Amino acid sequence: MACLSRIDANLLQYYEKPEPNNTVDLYVSNNSNNNGLKEGDKSISTPVPQPYGSEYSNCLLLSNSEYICYHFSSRSTLLTFYPLSDAYHGKTINIHLPNASMNQRYTLTIQEVEQQLLVNVILKDGSFLTLQLPLSFLFSSANTLNGEWFHLQNPYDFTVRVPHFLFYVSPQFSVVFLEDGGLLGLKKVDGVHYEPLLFNDNSYLKSLTRFFSRSSKSDYDSVISCKLFHERYLIVLTQNCHLKIWDLTSFTLIQDYDMVSQSDSDPSHFRKVEAVGEYLSLYNNTLVTLLPLENGLFQMGTLLVDSSGILTYTFQNNIPTNLSASAIWSIVDLVLTRPLELNVEASYLNLIVLWKSGTASKLQILNVNDESFKNYEWIESVNKSLVDLQSEHDLDIVTKTGDVERGFCNLKSRYGTQIFERAQQILSENKIIMAHNEDEEYLANLETILRDVKTAFNEASSITLYGDEIILVNCFQPYNHSLYKLNTTVENWFYNMHSETDGSELFKYLRTLNGFASTLSNDVLRSISKKFLDIITGELPDSMTTVEKFTDIFKNCLENQFEITNLKILFDELNSFDIPVVLNDLINNQMKPGIFWKKDFISAIKFDGFTSIISLESLHQLLSIHYRITLQVLLTFVLFDLDTEIFGQHISTLLDLHYKQFLLLNLYRQDKCLLAEVLLKDSSEFSFGVKFFNYGQLIAYIDSLNSNVYNASITENSFFMTFFRSYIIENTSHKNIRFFLENVECPFYLRHNEVQEFMFAMTLFSCGNFDQSYEIFQLHDYPEAINDKLPTFLEDLKSENYHGDSIWKDLLCTFTVPYRHSAFYYQLSLLFDRNNSQEFALKCISKSAEYSLKEIQIEELQDFKEKQHIHYLNLLIHFRMFEEVLDVLRLGHECLSDTVRTNFLQLLLQEDIYSRDFFSTLLRLCNAHSDNGELYLRTVDIKIVDSILSQNLRSGDWECFKKLYCFRMLNKSERAAAEVLYQYILMQADLDVIRKRKCYLMVINVLSSFDSAYDQWILNGSKVVTLTDLRDELRGL
C-alpha cells in the first residue's frame, strides 16, 4: 500500500523566464589565482543538450539554516550552486574547473567549514583543487569575490596510484581511496597546503606486484563506500563486500568482515561491485549494508566497542529487498534515520531507499519495528506525481474543442517554462513546426516530448532530509527536485483505489463510485462537472428545482453514455451502504478541514520559493483528489432518484465544495505564482507562508490552506477577486487575459449578481469582446445597483489616494458624483472610443446625453457638459452624421462656448473629407427651415459660419464665393449675398464676359426682388452701388 506520494518541484516553474535572474561564473585558472568574475547573461554556462544536465546533484543544510544545492556537470568540469529557498531571485554560481574530476563526483567533496563552503576535488591531471566560498557571497547579490578563493597543489603523484574515491573526514583531513585498494591520507599543514599520510597496509606493495605481473584491475579490492563513525573510525565496504574498520588515530586496519559469509544466501550468487556508490548508511551505532546478493540484500548490524576498547561489528539480520524481478533496479541513495511520522503501529528505525531503472525511480521505506531487527515492513510510495498521472487531460480538451491556444496555455502551465521551451527546442531541431491545419498533431508531438523531457529532468540523483524528516529527492537537472509527502487518508484511498486492500465503509463506497465513473469518458465527466458549476453560478435557472436540474444534466450529458449493466452493478452495490452516514463521514471528517489560526504555525519572515511551491503543489494534489471524489458522489444523485429531503444538505454542500475545488484548480492552471502569493498571504503572519520541518507540520499547513479555500465566500471569493484585480485592474501586459476569461471568468462568475456581471463586462472589454461587453454593461443600472457593494479593490479606485494607471479608475469614480448615470456612460464611451470601438462609444455617449436630458433636475458641472458634448460631436463626425452634429452645435450653446463651436465648424467646413457633405447638409436644413420662414441656425452661429466661409474668399475660387452666396441667401441675408457676388466680379480681372454677365444678372435679380427702390443697393467697401449702377456696368460689358 502506497503511503507517500511524489510532489515535483521545479524551482523555476512559476516564472516566465526559464533561467534564474542572477548568474555568476567563476573560472579557475591553472596559472594564477583568478579573482575576476564573469556575470552570466542569459543562462548557466552549460545549457543542457542532453536529457539531463548533470552527473550528480545534492543539497546541504548550512549553519545559517539555508539549503544550498549543487550540481556536478556530466563532463565533471562545472560545479553549480544555487539556494533552494529562492533559486530564481537568488544567485546561481557556476565554477568552471581547469580539468575534469579524476572520477566524476566520487573525487569531489563539499562541506561547510566556518561559514564557508569547502570544496575539494582531485583533477585528471593529478592536481588537488581547493575552493573556499563564503556563505555571505553565496547568499548576497554581490558578484565580486575578494581574496584567494581557490588553491591548486600537487601533494601526491596521483598519476601513479590513481584515486577513485575522495572522502572528507574533517577540515584538516581527507582520505583518498585508490584504485589498487590502498588508502592515502591528506592532512592540511599550514591552513592551505596538504601533505600525504600513508595508512598501515600493504596495498602499495600489492600494486607493485600487480604492475610487474601485469595483473588486471579486476584483481583489486577497492573501497566502494565509506562512513565515518565517532569521528575516529572509517567504516568502508570493498568491491568484494568486505566491511573494514580503520582507526584514524593509528591509521591501522582493526577489523575485516566478510559480509557475504554472514548472509543466508548462496555465495555463488554473489557478484562483485565495480562502481563507487551509496551502499552503507549509518545512524547512531546501527549500520545497514546493501549487498549484491540475489535481488539485493540489506544487512543490518550494530557497531559497539568491546571490553578491550576495540570497535566491533555485530550482525543482526538480513532483509531482502522488496523489488520486482521483472526490472533491473540500481541503488541511487539510502538513508538510515530515526522513525518518520508514517502512521505505523511500531517503529524503531527507518531506512529510506531510492532506486532507479533507466530514468524511472522508486522510493521505498523499510520500517524496522523493534531492536531485534526481525520485525519489519516495507512502505511503498507513488513514484509519479499527480500531474504526470493526469497528463492526458489537456490534449483531450484540445482535441475535442479545437482550442489550440488553450491547449498551449494548459501545457505550459503544467510543465513550466523551462521544460516547455526545452521541448519546443527539440521539436524545432527535428524540423517539426506548427503548420496550417496541423495544430492538434503538433500539440500531440509537443505533449509527448514534454513528458519525456520532464521524466529526464526528474531523474533522481540523491536524497536529502529536509527539516527533520521530509524526504527531498535531488534531480540531475538543475532546479528540479521532488518531495515525497505523507498521504492524508483521502489521498491514500485515491492512490490505492485499485488495490485489494480492505478498508472502511467509506473507502469501499468511494471504490464503488470510482468503478462506475471509470466507465465514462473524460468528455462526459467534464460536461457533467460544467453543469454542476452552472447550478451554482445560475446558468441553470434558479426557478428549476434540484430534481429538474439533475434531470436536465442526465438528458444533456449522460443519456446513452453508459452501459445499463454497469448502472445495475452500481445500484446493487450502493444498496449495501448507509449512504447518509457515509456522506457525513466523507464531508465532515475527510474533506472539511478543522479550524486553524496563523499562530498555529511558524511563519516565515522572508520568501521561500521551495516551501511555496511544495505548499501549492501539495494543495493542488489534495484538491484534485477531492474534486474527483466530489464529482463522482454528485454523479450518483444524477443517476438515481434519491430523496432530496434527506440528501438536500449533502447536495448543497457538495455543490459548494465542487465549485471551490474547480475554481482553485483552474486558478492553478492560470497562474501558479499568483495563486501561491494569495495563499501564503492569507495563511501566515508575514505573508511569506510558514516553515515546516516534519510531515505533521506540512500536512497541518496544507489543511489550513484547504480550510481557506473551503471557507471562502462564493459571492466574493478572495481568490477569484485577487486574480481579477491582477489581470483586469492592474492589467500587466504579460498576462494572458483571454485565457483568464475562458478558463476562470466565463465558467465561474455568478449570473444575476450585479457586481460579478459588471466585472464580467470589464473582462470582456479587456479581451476586446466589445459587443458582448456592451451588452453586459446594459444589464443593470450599475451606478445605482452596485455603488455600495463593490469589493474593496474596486472601491479603492474611487479614492483620491489611488495613484495607479488603471483604465477603470475614471469609470468607477463616476459612482461618486450626483450625475452618475450620464457620467458613467460618458466614461464608458471614452473607453470604447480609445479602443477603436466607435460604434459602442456612440451608443454610450448617446445614453449619456439621454440621462442628461432625463435627469434635468440634477446639476452637472459645466466642464463635464462641455467634455460630454465635445466627445459626442467627435463620434458623430466620425460616422458622418452631420445632421445630428448640427443639432448638437445649435442646441448646445449652454454647454459649448463660441470658441468650441467655431473650431468644430471650421473643421467641418474647411477639411476636404467633411466639407462637401457637411455643407450640403447644412444648406438642406437651412432651406427646409427658410420655407417655413424660420432660420435654422442662431444668429451667432450664422455669423460664425459666414466668417469661416468668408475666410476662403481670398483664394478667388468661384466655389468659395458660391458657397457663401448660397448660405447668405438661405439665411435671409440677400444683400450680403449680392455683395459677395459683386466682390467676385471685381476680384476677377480676367473673368470672361459670359461668366461676368451671369454674375451681374444674379446680383441685379437679388436687388430687383426688393420692393422699394431705396433698398436696391449694395456696398462695395464704403461706396454705395445702386441697381442702376449695376445695370449700366452690365451694358458696358
From Swiss-Prot:
GO terms for biological process: double-strand break repair; mRNA export from nucleus; mRNA export from nucleus in response to heat stress; negative regulation of transcription by RNA polymerase II; nuclear pore localization; nucleocytoplasmic transport; positive regulation of DNA-templated transcription; positive regulation of transcription by RNA polymerase II. The modification Phosphothreonine is found at T417. Functions as a component of the nuclear pore complex (NPC). NPC components, collectively referred to as nucleoporins (NUPs), can play the role of both NPC structural components and of docking or interaction partners for transiently associated nuclear transport factors. NUP120 is involved in nuclear poly(A)+ RNA and pre-ribosome export, in GSP1 nuclear import, in NPC assembly and distribution, as well as in nuclear envelope organization. This is Nucleoporin NUP120. The keyword Cell cycle does not apply. Residues 290-311 are annotated as: Leucine-zipper 2. The lineage of its organism: Eukaryota, Fungi, Dikarya, Ascomycota, Saccharomycotina. Keywords: Coiled coil, Membrane, mRNA transport, Nuclear pore complex, Nucleus, Phosphoprotein, Protein transport, Translocation, Transport. One of its GO terms (molecular function) is structural constituent of nuclear pore. Component of the nuclear pore complex (NPC). NPC constitutes the exclusive means of nucleocytoplasmic transport. NPCs allow the passive diffusion of ions and small molecules and the active, nuclear transport receptor-mediated bidirectional transport of macromolecules such as proteins, RNAs, ribonucleoparticles (RNPs), and ribosomal subunits across the nuclear envelope. Due to its 8-fold rotational symmetry, all subunits are present with 8 copies or multiples thereof. It is found in: Nucleus, Nuclear pore complex; Nucleus membrane. One of its GO terms (cellular component) is nuclear membrane. Residues 131-152 are annotated as: Leucine-zipper 1. The keyword Phosphoprotein applies. It is a peripheral membrane protein. InterPro entries: Nucleoporin_Nup160, NUP120_helical_saccharomycetes.
